[in-house]
Amino acid sequence: MKTGKELKPGTVIRIDNDPWLVQKAEFTKSGRNSAIMKTKLKNLLTGYKTETVYGADDKLDDVILDRKEATLSFISGDSYTFMDTTDYTMYELNAEDIESVLPFVEEGMTDVCEAVFFEGRLVSVELPTTIVRQVDYTEGSARGDTSGKVMKPAKLKNGTELSVADFIEIGDMIEIDTREGGSYKGRAK
């Protein structure tokens, strides 16, 4: 059992026998009212999304999910096929099922992912917390602007855009933190 104040992004809870993924959780406490947790939830079976408010002391059933290592095998339109690294079983997911990691999924990637199962059914895939990708396009460095942390926009091979350090050039390999939507960590070593 979890309480409302323990909810955080990535937590899975059970509502009406369905697993719901907490995508966003915001704790609010005002002077007069009791503490509440505002959440954005996604049903892992149907993909339905909703916003719900829980009291800080509300009791919620947490869900234990099975996890297996998998790699991306191939992409066909909006269908992504992953292969279990131990028994080579193939699993297929739609783009909506993996929309949180979709900006960092690309053909030919070698990252070992975690396939997430609920009662034997594949419901999502999680990437490692740090991945390495190649910068496909970025502007040149801005001369003279060296005060503080200078960032500029860059585009990856699959079209994903993010901010990178000013010294990064086209073709450089960069590390990306995949939590919270993905952010630049540094140049890959």
From Swiss-Prot:
InterPro entries: Elong-fact-P_C, NA-bd_OB-fold, Rib_uL2_dom2, Transl_elong_fac_P/YeiP, Transl_elong_KOW-like, Transl_elong_P/YeiP_cen, Transl_elongation_fac_P, Translation_prot_SH3-like_sf. One of its GO terms (molecular function) is translation elongation factor activity. Pathway: Protein biosynthesis; polypeptide chain elongation. Keywords: Cytoplasm, Elongation factor, Protein biosynthesis. It is found in: Cytoplasm. Pfam families: EFP, EFP_N, Elong-fact-P_C. GO terms for cellular component: cytoplasm. One of its GO terms (biological process) is peptide biosynthetic process. Gene3D superfamilies: 2.30.30.30, Nucleic acid-binding proteins. Involved in peptide bond synthesis. Stimulates efficient translation and peptide-bond synthesis on native or reconstituted 70S ribosomes in vitro. Probably functions indirectly by altering the affinity of the ribosome for aminoacyl-tRNA, thus increasing their reactivity as acceptors for peptidyl transferase. Belongs to the elongation factor P family. This is Elongation factor P. It comes from Pseudomonas fluorescens (strain Pf0-1). The gene is efp.
